[in-house]
Amino acid sequence: GIVRDDETELESALRTAVNNDGVDALVTSGGVSMGDYDIVKSVLSRIADMSWFQIAMKPAKPFAFGTLRNDDGVDVPVFGLPGNPVSSLVSFELIARPALEVMMHTADSMTGRRRVKGIIDYAVARQPDGKIHFDRCVASWGADGRIHVARVAAQASHQLAATALANALVEIPDGHGVGAGDEVLVTLLGAGGHLPTTA
């Protein structure tokens, strides 16, 4: 649920989740960066065993992982996602979801995401910054029988409406970009990573 920016309320909600609600894992969104209102970091640093990361990816640089021990002595995994909606989505799909699928023993099932090679149908110019960039895209079968990806219009990390149109994340390696027609790595976001079968 939603918790206000209040440390007492947040601590109570987290402890209730691990003690009364019987959760197997906690996923938080927001408050894990360096700002004045990033109280999730403040509270979890005090009550949990956490590690805080600045991951070399864009979007979704801030990320946290650790455990919060419940009253029965069980260490419950905690995934701390960034608060920006697109950053939160990307970090969940690429980091938290795979870990949760391993916990559920479903990593190789039909519900998992697939990472495949595809052809990018547009050029991306970028500058080296030490990060892997992830474009939100629409993947479909091309006439050549391969997966092709087209970019959704808006790529800014606050553009949730445009991101909702995407069914794939495309990896743009660190460097000077990729050209139209290049082969890229694609994470398919649909259940089981499936696309419509028609070309």
What do these predicted regions represent?
Residues 1-47:
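N-terminal small/polar loop signature for handling phosphorylated ligands or for N-terminal nucleophile
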Residues 43-199:
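Flexible glycine/proline-rich
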